[in-house]
Structure formats: C-alpha cells, structure tokens
Amino acid sequence: MFGPAARFPYDPKAAYIPADAPFEVLQKLHGRLGIERAVIVHASCHGADMRVTLDAIARSGGRYRGTAIIDESYGDLEFKKMHDGGIRGVRFNFVRHLGGPPEMGFFNRTVERVQAMGWHLILHLDAADLVEFDALFRKIRVPMVIDHMGRVKAADGLQQKPFQVLLEWMKQDNFWVKICGAERVSSKGPPFTDAVPFGRALVEAAPERVLWGTDWPHPNVKWMPDDGALVDLFPLMVPEPALQQRILVENPESLYGFQGR
C-alpha cells in the first residue's frame, strides 16, 4: 500500500514517490480477486515509518499480517509494538534501484533480533545478488523469504546460475520463496507465461516453503499487469489442488501467525 500521503507521508529520501494506493483500494482489489487474508509488505517509499502498515492490519479485523522496514532507532519497545500489531518479519532491499545492500553490521544485528522475536527475514534481491551473497545467506539460520522468485530473468533460462543457487537454497529448511512478480521475471511481457516454469520449479523443490502474492500495486515495473491475469498464472505454476491449498492457506498460516499464532 502507498499512502494516502496526506495521512501517511512518503519518506523524502525514498528512491521513488508513487501515486497513492491506499487501504480502501486494496480492499476493493481483494474483494474482486476473492482474497480473504493477506500479508502487507511495508513499502520502502514509507521508509521505517510503520504507521501505514500497522493501520491497515488494525483495520483488517484479523485478516492481515505484515512485514516491516526498520532502522537503527528500533529497540525493544518498537519491536513489541510491531509484534502486537501483527508484524512478523523484517524486509531488506538489496536491489540497487532501492539503495543497495544494507550496512552489514546493522543487518547482522537485525538477524539476531529477528531470531529472538521468532520472526523471519524477507530478502528483496536482484538475480546477481543470489550469487554474490550466497555464502552469507547460507550461514543464516532464521527463516528467510526470497521475494519475486529472486528477480531472475526468464530469458536466461532455468539453468542460469542465480536460479540454480536459489534452488540450492530451497534444500535448506529455513529458506522460503514467493512465486510472485511474474511481471518482473518475464522477458516477453504480458501475459508473463515465460515466468511460469520458474514458479513451477520452485514449487517442485519445496512446496512446504512456497508463498504467493499479488505484488500490488506493482511499483517500478516495465509492464503494468492486470491483477486478475496474475492470479490466472497461479494454477499454471501449481496445478495440484492440494498444493494450491498448501501454498495459499497453510504455508502463510504457519509463517505469518494467522489464527492467533
């Protein structure tokens, strides 16, 4: 979600300032798509000001959880407030267009904090980062969710080094992946079906640690997707009804603490 800026101002240091895409619009989208529960990924354009995400979770009547972006000012009180407000993870943007990798001392301290909270990390990476930070991430034992299928490029094929690294990560029981962002993985554009084999391969690797999401409202994309069309890609990646139930319902219940956890 973005804004509205009049109530939830954007970070003046943000890499991008989007048009408002507030809670009310998200509600309409979820109603149209038939989505009952969701995880709000706090947007980098709001910086470490978590008010917009905490407000949405509070207004959701228990249907939403969220992930955070933090800075060095966050201590015990802030983490307790976020946990009580439905936050269950901290996201780091390694991608260069959003500022690049974090300061490693801060990153390592946050890993320790996340472990103590029983949360997880969300890693937003470019394909090259999967190779560059391979050794670092393999040493971390807290749960880690890799966003957007690692932002690999479909044109480079399933055998490309970054995707093979991602598949190796999925052999460790603390790595998770989101099979979202087909519009970012695709090299051909709509309907983004060239991203489907990547999602399918990840599901085959570890269906018990795969998540799905819309990635709405799709900032910084070359092709603005239709959200209904993105939903239609899901059964192409996951044709089995039992695995659909697992990925859409059971996996997020486990990781994000729905139903009171």
Task: Tell what function each PLM region has.
Residues 48-64, 196-206, 227-236:
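Short, electropositive alpha-helical surface patch
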Residues 1-48:
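An N-terminally biased module of ancient metal coordination in phosphate/nucleic-acid-related enzymes
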Residues 1, 43, 149, 214-216:
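Active-site metal-binding loops of divalent metal-dependent hydrolases
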Residues 17-37, 201, 207-209, 222-261:
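Mid-to-C-terminal alpha-helical segments outside catalytic/metal-binding sites
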Residues 30, 53, 82, 90, ...:
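Conserved, mostly hydrophobic/aromatic
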Residues 45-128, 135-138, 176-182:
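Active-site gating/metal-coordination segments in enzymes
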Residues 1, 31, 105-106, 110, ...:
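A generic "structured core" feature
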Residues 103-212, 260:
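Catalytic pocket-lining loop regions of alpha/beta-barrel enzymes
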